[in-house]
């Protein structure tokens, strides 16, 4: 089959046409991929940075954001049938550790990542356990279904705390950050402010419903808060940037008793003024992946109740033009990039 493969221990990803079709175990589902999306993780793997070198075995079929149709099911699978439109949870868990048995599969200490530690979805076919397959309702477009993985990250992070009537600061205007901003507005936050230094992505944040999108390289965040009539600090912080300076500013403008969910990963140790956390009584929560499968349920429910994410998909290419897609993603001047496998729905 045709697939995008991390075939060499160097920068780049390569199209190969002779990749073996993955085998289907008795509890597995084979999905024929119709559309894929490029994730920031895929860019890290493309760049072959320090994290990728330590994490990804080579060769590896990459990719974990997709939508497709069930092609084949294992002998013990009864919940799905060929032809159904589906996506899939990209974290394969053990099912036996304490967290898995308690229904907290997103905290499994033995998680294996699709497209990172096992063959992924930048391929004509991907095989995952049936437990990881999620059926897509007919009223959700393919382009949106293809980005359920990062949409799930945004949902898990944004819905970590009650947002109704709250003032929310999102640090980082990447695709996940702007989707989190849209979610916050959808569920009833009062002011949703997004910060970044990338004007392209700040404009995208405005289109996604942010009250204000602030370039902190040249704008005063506290002045913006004053203009919005905020007399105290932010009630909820969503840290999406993985930038130490952004996180420190977030701590400075949080209200006492504020709550912070952290999804962004800082590249190394960062000096933090912990007195901001202690004396303000802040709550910090690390977020990884999606809650299985409550996050997925809420994603569908929000889309069906009017959440509009269409603006976040900014570029579309044929899979044969994947290099253009990666170039756009690496430029920083894009939202989500979707690759079409040319398969009829």
From Swiss-Prot:
It comes from the Bacteria. One of its GO terms (biological process) is L-threonine catabolic process to glycine. GO terms for cellular component: cytoplasm. Keywords: Cytoplasm, Metal-binding, NAD, Oxidoreductase, Zinc. It is found in: Cytoplasm. Its EC number is 1.1.1.103. Belongs to the zinc-containing alcohol dehydrogenase family. Catalyzes the NAD(+)-dependent oxidation of L-threonine to 2-amino-3-ketobutyrate. Homotetramer. This is L-threonine 3-dehydrogenase. It comes from Anaeromyxobacter dehalogenans (strain 2CP-C). The lineage of its organism: Bacteria, Pseudomonadati, Myxococcota, Myxococcia, Myxococcales.
């Amino acid at each position: 089959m045709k697939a995008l493969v991390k075939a060499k221990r160097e920068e780049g990803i390569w199209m190969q046409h002779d990749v073996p079709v993955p085998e289907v175990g008795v509890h597995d589902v084979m999905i024929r991929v119709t559309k894929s999306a490029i994730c920031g993780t895929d860019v890290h793997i493309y760049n072959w940075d320090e994290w990728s070198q330590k994490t990804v075995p080579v060769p590896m079929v990459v990719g974990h954001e997709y939508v497709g149709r069930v092609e084949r099911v294992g002998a013990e699978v009864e919940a799905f049938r060929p032809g159904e439109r589906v996506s899939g949870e990209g974290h394969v868990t053990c099912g036996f550790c304490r967290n898995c048995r308690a229904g907290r599969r997103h905290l499994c200490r033995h998680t294996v990542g699709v497209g990172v530690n096992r063959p992924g979805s930048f391929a004509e076919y991907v095989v995952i356990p049936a437990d990881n397959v999620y059926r897509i309702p007919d009223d959700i477009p393919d382009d949106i279904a293809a980005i359920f993985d990062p949409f799930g990250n945004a949902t898990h992070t944004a819905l970590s705390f009650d947002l109704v009537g709250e003032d929310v600061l999102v640090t980082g205007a990447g695709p996940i950050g702007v989707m989190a901003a849209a979610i916050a507005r959808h569920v009833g936050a009062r002011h949703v402010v997004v910060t970044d230094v990338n004007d392209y992505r700040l404009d995208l944040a405005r289109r996604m419903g942010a009250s204000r999108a602030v370039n902190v390289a040249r704008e005063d965040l506290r002045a913006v808060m004053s203009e919005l009539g905020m007399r105290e600090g932010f009630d909820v912080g969503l840290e999406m940037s993985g930038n130490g300076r952004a996180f420190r500013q977030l701590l400075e403008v949080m209200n006492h008793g504020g709550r912070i969910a952290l999804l962004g990963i800082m590249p190394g140790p960062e000096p933090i003024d912990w007195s901001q956390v202690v004396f303000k009584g802040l709550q910090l929560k690390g977020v990884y992946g999606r809650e299985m499968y409550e996050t997925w349920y809420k994603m569908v429910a929000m889309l069906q109740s009017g959440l509009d994410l269409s603006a976040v998909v900014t570029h579309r290419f044929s899979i044969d033009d994947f290099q253009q897609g990666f170039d756009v993603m690496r430029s920083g001047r894009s939202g989500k990039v979707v690759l079409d496998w040319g398969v009829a729905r």
